[in-house]
Amino acid sequence: MDLEVDIVKNKKIDVQKAIKMTYKENKRSSLVIYLILRFLVIICMILQILRGDLNNALLCLLSLILLFAPLFIQNKLEITLPNDLEIAIYLFIFSAEILGEIDNFFGIIPYWDIILHTINGFLATAVGFSLVDLLNKNSKNINLSPFYLCLVAFCFSMTIGVLWEFFEYSCDKFLNVDMQKDTVIQKISSVALNPDGENKAVVVDDIGKTIIYDTNGDVLQVIDNGYLDIGLNDTIEDLFVNFIGAIVFSCFAFLDLKHNRSNSFINRFVPTKANNKLIKSI
């Protein structure tokens, strides 16, 4: 038993050394990006604390944890993230949490949210693409069709997208934030407005203004130019662009697998097991 424990410990140490060697030889750029972004997030967190904005300070803390996640995952799961994928993950986290939420790029820059969700769909598909290999590391012979493998990766990406929308909805409901961005619309259709209680939608078009009253009849808010959709359009839009990102990667992956391309575009974004050659050489 002691011998088995020692073997496992030595294997973990070898994997850690292999990962460190990989960073020194092939992934210096991702390490530099990580250190720069971590420094910027720490500066941002200090500024938020000085301003008394604890919510943004906690968001910075969350960003630091997320930035560390790729390093932790590689060490824990004994895998190697491609340099391009790792850099993309770091930039995605910084763009979403710091630039998007704290610096309000979601409100200032048009389509910022759409761009990030599209990238998320692409990257999540890359991770899903590698899951079959990573979760079946004890199976030496796995012969799956390219279509099936791409389908699994696509479904994984869409599942991540749906879970993220669940997270946004929960934050909006319980923390009174607005992660599911609202949209002013001029047309609604609802069976709740049917005076006879029938299952027939009543269409209200050309809405010019919405006035919100409290229970005492006092005006709380006036919404000009329409009616607030409470995040539905944003949710569907996010899922749709996630779908597009997942489809794009799946198509590239299918073509590469079909034509047996070893040095392909998708390999720059697909995690693999820790390099056995490096481990043996240590």
Report the location of each language-model feature.
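Aromatic-anchored segments of alpha-helical transmembrane domains
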Residues: 39-44, 91-101, 158-162
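Membrane-interface helix caps and helix-loop-helix hairpins in membrane proteins
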Residues: 49-54, 76-79, 102-112
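Structural signature of hydrophobic alpha-helical transmembrane segments
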Residues: 51-64
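Alpha-helical transmembrane segments that form the membrane-embedded catalytic/substrate-binding core
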Residues: 117-124, 152-202, 229-253
